[in-house]
Every structure is written in structure tokens, then in C-alpha cells.
Amino acid sequence: MNHFELFGLPPQFSLDGSLLSSQFRELQKRFHPDNFATASERDRLLAVQKAAQINDAYQVLKNPISRAEYLLSQNGLEIRGEQQTMQDPMFLMEQMELREELEEIPHGSDAESALAAFDARVSKMYKQHLATIEQELNDAQWPQAADRVRKLKFIAKLKNEIELVEEKLFG
């Protein structure tokens, strides 16, 4: 049973987050190990395994990057944990320039405004990549979607770096 089947959801990138959460809570209740305290050793072990499977599946499906990676793996393209290097020099150059720009923001005269504008630009880029990934997955364009997910991981890492700069600047 795959993660989507476990939650009774269609195997697609676009998910109803509230439905996923409610299904998760329902499955958690149903298979909580405490409910099997008086059951046989085998049934208790199965309940623990099922609870772990539910938690793992939820973690994968609630995150758009891991959900896209999972959909790709379900369609024969395994990119989770891969060490493949990015093959798009223009994208890599853009990422380097963005990181350099982020490094300079704290030294500018209006760091708060500059960081907010930079964050908005990167967030827009992130959302555009998500929309493209959704379309590519819907159209079964697996290699293109895989490349886009690789790029999205770079952008997500940049978003995390923005948060770190924000914490340093504003506590």
C-alpha cells in the first residue's frame, strides 16, 4: 500500500492539506499502540509498525518536495538522497548570485526592507517552481519534474538561509 492509498487520497501532487491532516489524525487514533495494549504480542507489534508507517507517510505527503520525490519514485524515478549534480549552469549561476546578494543584505543601510524584498522574490520563485512541478507531474513528464524538484531544493535551502539571516538581524 502506497502513502496515498494509506490516506485514501488520489496519487497526485496537489493535495487538500486539511483532508490529509484529518485522515492522519483518524489513522493515528485507530492504530495507536495504546489501543492494542491487551492484544497479542504480534498484534501489538503490527500496531507499532502501522503507526510508524502512518507517521512516515504523513511526513512525506505534507511536504511538497518530499511529496514530489515520492510521486517520482512511484513512477520509476528515484531522486531522494541522490548525489547527482545539477546540470543547469544558468540556474547554478543564478543561485550563486542570489546567495551573494543575501550575504550583502545585513551590511546594507536598510537591511529589513532589503531582506523583505529578497524574501518576496525568492518566495515567488519557489511558488512558480511548485506550479511547474505540479503541471509536469500531472502531464507525466517525469524527467522534467525531477530536474525541477532538484532546483526547488536549492530554492528551499535559500529560503532557509533567509530565515537564518532574519534571525541574526532581528533576533
Swiss-Prot record:
Domain of life: Bacteria
Keywords from the UniProt entry: Chaperone
Entry-linked Pfam families: DnaJ, HSCB_C
Family annotation (InterPro entries): DnaJ_domain, HscB, HscB_C_sf, HscB_oligo_C, J_dom_sf
SUPFAM superfamilies assigned to the protein according to its UniProt record, in alphabetical order: Chaperone J-domain (SSF46565), HSC20 (HSCB), C-terminal oligomerisation domain (SSF47144)
Species: Vibrio vulnificus (strain CMCP6)
Family, per entry: Belongs to the HscB family.
Subunit structure: Interacts with HscA and stimulates its ATPase activity.
CDD domains: DnaJ
One GO term describing the cellular component: iron-sulfur cluster transfer complex
GO BP of this protein: [2Fe-2S] cluster assembly; protein complex oligomerization; protein folding
Protein name, as recorded: Co-chaperone protein HscB homolog
Entry function: Co-chaperone involved in the maturation of iron-sulfur cluster-containing proteins. Seems to help targeting proteins to be folded toward HscA.
GO molecular function, one term: protein-folding chaperone binding
Domain J: start-end pairs: 2-74
